[in-house]
């Protein structure tokens, strides 16, 4: 089985990659940082079972580069069973104060890149009448919060893309799952003054995501909401 995970060198993406590989999946990892990808490849391919890890340096904020990556995957991999659109960006700011261009930059990575990558890979899945697409959205996909202007807009839109794909892909046997995690530990939190149990470990989110791939073809998990036990920050 072959899985494609974008934004897969840290946080939720890396945790998902490791969980999949530990369960026998071969994985394709992508990031803008080639050194990080090389480190991930060594880590993944050292796991029991000798999983393969295909790495590619990609800037998903560029449409043409995203499409080229998808086309390369179709040539390199024997099939694509699972696509996890995880790459994303967050720029804090309110709609009326954020810099000009922040919305466009945020939408390019959080919405347009999964849109174009999914469209590139879908014909292969549809031809096989088999596949699974998982979009890593956010609790910001259904609720707004202060200082989350462009990010909230982009994540609402990503959930809309997921819902549209879910309806379109039912006849083709392709499952579509939207995952809405709350605050999850990652490097982006830096030295944030929170105790360990205030944010979720990415491994918990990864376990939930990967669990949806174990179901029979008769079942589909449409949406998952996972939050810190103590609630949102």
Language-model region placement:
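C-terminal helical subdomain
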Residues: 171, 178, 194-233
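Active-site helix of classical SDR
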Residues: 118, 154
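Conserved glycine-rich cofactor-binding loop
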Residues: 9-10
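Conserved glycine-rich Rossmann-like NAD(P)H-binding loop of the short-chain dehydrogenase/reductase
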Residues: 23-39
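Residue(s) in the substrate-gating loop at a strand-loop-helix junction
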Residues: 138
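The beta1-alpha1 cofactor-binding region of Rossmann-like NAD(H)/NADP(H)-dependent oxidoreductases
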Residues: 34, 57-68, 100
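Substrate-binding pocket helix/loop in short-chain dehydrogenase/reductase
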Residues: 94-95, 99-104
């Amino acid at each position: 089985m072959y899985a494609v995970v974008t934004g897969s060198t840290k946080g939720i993406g890396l945790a998902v990659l490791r969980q999949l590989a530990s369960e026998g999946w071969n994985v394709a990892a992508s990031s803008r940082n080639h050194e990080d990808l090389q480190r991930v490849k060594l880590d993944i391919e050292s796991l029991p079972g000798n999983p393969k890890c295909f790495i590619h340096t990609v800037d998903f904020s560029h449409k043409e580069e995203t499409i080229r990556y998808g086309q390369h995957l179709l040539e390199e991999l024997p099939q694509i069973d699972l696509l996890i659109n995880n790459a994303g960006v967050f720029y804090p700011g309110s709609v009326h104060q954020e810099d000009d261009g922040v919305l466009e930059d945020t939408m390019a990575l959080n919405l347009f890149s999964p849109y174009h990558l999914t469209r590139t890979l879908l014909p292969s899945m549809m031809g096989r009448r088999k596949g699974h697409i998982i979009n890593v959205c956010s609790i910001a996909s259904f609720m707004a919060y202060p200082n989350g202007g462009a990010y909230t807009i982009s994540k609402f839109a990503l959930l809309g893309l997921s819902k549209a794909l879910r309806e379109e892909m039912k006849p083709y046997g392709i499952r579509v799952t939207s995952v809405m995690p709350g605050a999850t530990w990652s490097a982006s939190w830096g030295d944030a003054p929170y105790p360990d149990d205030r944010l979720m470990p990415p491994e918990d989110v990864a376990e939930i995501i990967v669990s949806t791939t174990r179901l029979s073809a008769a079942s589909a998990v449409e949406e998952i909401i996972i939050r810190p036990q103590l609630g949102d920050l």
